């Protein structure tokens, strides 16, 4: 499988600041990856510090003065990578409640809804379908600081909100789960996408309650507890405005066929 992905952003820097981007794909062992990444401020290239994190997360950090910053990223991935590695630390960390996936508020609720499926891969299908049936995908319906509880009460959200609710439900029934930002060929409307990963029967398996893109062609960008760990842009000082964002993600040939009951790993 060949996948071409990319992102173009234009950021107006209103006051000097420090920016961190997570738009570059994570390492994909045993695949062929070619990529380019540039940062241009008022026509002049600037350098970013690449910081490597857990799960292959790649943060590109820079201090920028007032001006207009253009970010251009493109990557081609040929083949599929190995399944995500497993560590005991991760299995502990991803059982815990986090800022946007408040699993501790769902313990009784999740046990009632999904208690019969806790020891089965059927759980993933049930949680995905449950979240998908409870929420409406409505761009602009949620705030960046909304968590899983807010999403369930609102009955609407975008991909990050679906992922947070899936993760919270899974953690609440003692299944390690985390959020992953991805490039998603076939997604409409095209954007950065967020999905959940759950640890079941020895593997990290992807769950996407939105059903907006086939899981088999997803490309991993960043992995973490919730959206706070995987944001494509973090601003740490001055004021900025995101004036443009275009995301692309395509496969060579037909998109894979997906079914909610299929067990899929991000590759």
What are these regions (language model features)?
Residues 23, 27, 31-37, 211-242, ...:
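Glycine-rich, small/acidic residue-mixed loop/short-helix segments
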Residues 34-41, 47-51, 66-68, 99-104, ...:
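Short, surface-exposed, polar/charged, turn-prone segments marking secondary-structure boundaries
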């Amino acid at each position: 499988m060949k996948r071409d992905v990319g992102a173009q952003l234009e950021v107006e820097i209103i006051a000097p600041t420090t920016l961190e981007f997570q738009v570059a794909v994570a390492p994909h062992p045993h695949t062929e990856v070619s990529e380019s990444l540039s940062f241009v401020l008022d026509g002049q290239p600037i350098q970013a510090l690449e910081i490597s994190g857990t799960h292959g997360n790649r943060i590109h950090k820079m201090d920028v003065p007032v001006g207009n910053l253009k970010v251009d990223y493109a990557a081609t991935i040929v083949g599929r990578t190995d399944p995500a590695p497993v560590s005991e630390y991760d299995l502990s960390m991803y059982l815990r409640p986090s800022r946007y996936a408040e699993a501790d508020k769902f313990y009784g609720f999740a046990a009632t809804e999904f208690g019969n499926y806790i020891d089965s891969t059927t759980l993933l299908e049930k949680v995905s379908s449950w979240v998908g049936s409870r929420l409406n995908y409505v761009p602009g319906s949620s705030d960046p600081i909304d968590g899983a509880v807010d999403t369930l009460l609102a009955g609407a959200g975008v991909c990050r909100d679906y992922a947070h609710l899936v993760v919270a439900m899974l953690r609440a029934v003692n299944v390690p789960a985390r959020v992953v930002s991805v490039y998603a060929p076939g997604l409409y409307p095209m954007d950065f996408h967020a999905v959940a990963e759950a640890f079941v029967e020895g593997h990290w398996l992807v769950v996407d309650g939105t059903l907006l893109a086939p899981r088999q062609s997803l490309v991993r960008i960043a992995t973490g507890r919730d959206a706070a760990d995987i944001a494509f842009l973090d601003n740490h000082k001055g004021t900025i405005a995101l004036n443009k964002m275009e995301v692309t993600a395509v496969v060579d040939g037909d998109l894979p066929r997906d079914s909610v009951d299929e067990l899929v790993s991000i590759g």
